[in-house]
């Protein structure tokens, strides 16, 4: 499987950047140690990871990505697969692609910017031939408020519960295509903001 090849042998850098304890910097070495990532360099050039952004607000800067890669002793590798519109750089999207680059060095990093929300992204994704191996979504919203203002009305005036069920079915289809879908637990942790 493509995912088994994702993290082949990790080779520690011969000249890691030296920073002092307590100086506030968190470099790649800290993340790898903190999360016990022992194989972070992708050897298979076909492996791809993708930051998914919504509501047409995601944007990245390849220059910022290259700076991050250089400061962390990584090989510079631009994002060439951008689906949708790359708006001006946004902090969340920048963080997403930079973290992917750090924990999966040398992977083909994508950015996918959808104009709407979960369901429309899923339909667009499932109707696309050339897709990434791994999706990472760091967006979230209360389950009971999926059809509330700010997100737009749900298709066919569904309730939030119906919408979630439909979205879940579409994401199962992504898994059946062999795509790994990783979703953050949110800024407030797994229980969310509204429990």
Regions found by a protein language model. Name each.
Residues 1-195:
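Substrate-binding/charge-relay-adjacent region of secreted/lumenal peptidase catalytic domains
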């Amino acid at each position: 499987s493509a995912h088994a090849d994702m993290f082949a042998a990790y080779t520690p850098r011969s000249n890691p950047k030296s920073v002092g304890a307590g100086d506030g910097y968190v470099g790649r070495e800290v993340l790898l140690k903190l999360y016990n990532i022992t194989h972070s360099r992708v050897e298979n050039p076909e492996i791809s990871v993708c930051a998914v952004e919504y509501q047409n607000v995601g944007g990245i800067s390849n220059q910022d990505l290259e700076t991050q890669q250089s400061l962390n002793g990584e090989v510079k590798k631009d994002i060439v697969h951008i689906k949708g519109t790359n708006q001006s750089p946004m902090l969340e999207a920048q963080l997403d692609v930079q973290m992917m680059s750090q924990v999966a060095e040398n992977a083909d990093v994508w950015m996918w910017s959808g104009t709407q929300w979960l369901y429309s992204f899923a339909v667009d994704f499932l109707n696309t031939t050339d897709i990434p191996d791994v999706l990472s979504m760091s967006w979230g919203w209360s389950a009971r408020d999926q059809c509330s203002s700010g997100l737009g009305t749900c298709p066919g005036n569904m309730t939030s519960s119906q919408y979630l069920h439909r979205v879940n079915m579409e994401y199962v289809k992504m898994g059946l295509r062999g795509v790994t879908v990783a979703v953050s637990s949110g800024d407030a942790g797994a229980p969310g903001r509204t429990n």
